[in-house]
């Protein structure tokens, strides 16, 4: 019986060890912002000044908290960066393409990791309900990556409290101001770098839809990983429980034959005593 209890306790401890990585992935995601953001200046210098990048954005409003603005902007940056990355596939001049591709790929990874830290599934209803706040525009690289840097700054500001703050819009939401785009188009200084021959043609609808699927697919990758860990843990617990029950059933019935043998031995002693008494009585009668 003690061995069966020890086996069940061991399986329970293994279950806790398997669930530990799941708790860690849900409670902490580390720092998704790496030093690769320092290469943005080089990338902006490599892209033509008149190149336009499409982005759906939400203008800053007093009634929209910064951490909620972050939830609205990050998925759109992920889509735009995926589209930008795909456009380098069709470029024949490979002089600066590899460098630019590497930088954009690193920035895409950062924004995707950041999106995983934001618990996108938790606030997707908030994003759907406030889709009317989006405006679509085409930005030159300088202004596009200024917005990108602003998004990174907001994340750093609220990184420790994002899990605690839910996005709830007030009953009355102000409309985006007309001069909001003016704030976006302020110039910033980047070091001049030779511009590459990146073409400004748009990708076909199939390529665009594929990149959107990739962006959306990453959103659910973290949740799928958590589900797989949870299922593995539950399966191990079930197997451990079944093995414990089988072991207990095999060891427990062994105690019954022992008790039967003991009972039989007691019966034999009583019979022997009775037979001895009977013999003594016979001898006494004979005498």
Curated annotation (Swiss-Prot):
Molecular function GO terms recorded: cytokine activity; growth factor activity; stem cell factor receptor binding
Positions of disulphide bridges: 29-117, 68-167
Topological domains annotated Extracellular: 26-225
Cytoplasmic side: 247-287
Keywords: Cell adhesion, Cell membrane, Cell projection, Cytoplasm, Cytoskeleton, Disulfide bond, Glycoprotein, Growth factor, Membrane, Secreted, Signal, Transmembrane, Transmembrane helix
Transmembrane regions listed in the UniProt entry: 226-246
Entry PTM: A soluble form is produced by proteolytic processing of isoform 1 in the extracellular domain.
Glycosylation sites: 100, 106, 149, 178, 200, 206
Annotated InterPro entries: 4_helix_cytokine-like_core, SCF
Leader peptide range in chain numbering: 1-25
GO annotation terms (biological process): cell adhesion; positive regulation of cell population proliferation
GO cellular component: cytoplasm; cytoskeleton; extracellular region; filopodium; lamellipodium; plasma membrane
PANTHER family, per the entry: KIT LIGAND
Assembly and interaction partners: Homodimer, non-covalently linked.
Function (record text): Ligand for the receptor-type protein-tyrosine kinase KIT. Plays an essential role in the regulation of cell survival and proliferation, hematopoiesis, stem cell maintenance, gametogenesis, mast cell development, migration and function, and in melanogenesis. KITLG/SCF binding can activate several signaling pathways. Acts synergistically with other cytokines, probably interleukins.
Family classification: Belongs to the SCF family.
Name recorded for this polypeptide: Kit ligand
């Amino acid at each position: 019986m003690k061995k069966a209890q020890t086996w069940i306790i061991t399986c329970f401890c293994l279950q806790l060890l398997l669930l530990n990585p799941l708790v860690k992935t849900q409670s902490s995601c580390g720092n998704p912002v790496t030093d690769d953001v320092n290469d943005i200046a080089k990338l902006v210098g490599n892209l033509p000044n008149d190149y336009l990048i499409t982005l759906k954005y939400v203008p800053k409003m007093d009634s929209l908290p910064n951490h909620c603005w972050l939830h609205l902007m990050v998925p759109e940056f992920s889509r735009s960066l995926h589209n930008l990355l795909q456009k380098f596939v069709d470029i024949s001049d490979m002089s600066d393409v590899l460098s630019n591709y590497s930088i954009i790929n690193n920035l895409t990874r950062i924004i995707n990791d950041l999106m995983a830290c934001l618990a996108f599934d938790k606030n997707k209803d908030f994003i759907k309900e406030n889709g009317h706040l989006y405006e679509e525009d085409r930005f030159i690289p300088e202004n596009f990556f200024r917005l990108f840097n602003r998004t990174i700054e907001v994340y750093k500001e609220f990184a420790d409290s994002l899990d605690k703050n839910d996005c709830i819009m007030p009953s009355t939401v102000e409309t985006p101001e007309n001069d909001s785009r003016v704030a976006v188009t302020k110039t910033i200084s980047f070091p001049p770098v030779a511009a590459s021959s990146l073409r400004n043609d748009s990708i076909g609808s199939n390529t665009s839809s594929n990149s959107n699927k990739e962006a959306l697919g990453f959103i659910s990758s973290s949740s799928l990983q958590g589900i797989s860990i949870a299922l593995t843990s539950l399966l191990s617990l079930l197997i451990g429980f079944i093995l414990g029950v089988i072991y207990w059933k095999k060891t427990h019935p062994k105690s019954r034959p022992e008790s039967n043998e003991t009972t039989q031995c007691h019966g034999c002693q009583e019979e022997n005593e009775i037979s001895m008494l009977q013999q003594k009585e016979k001898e006494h009668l004979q005498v």
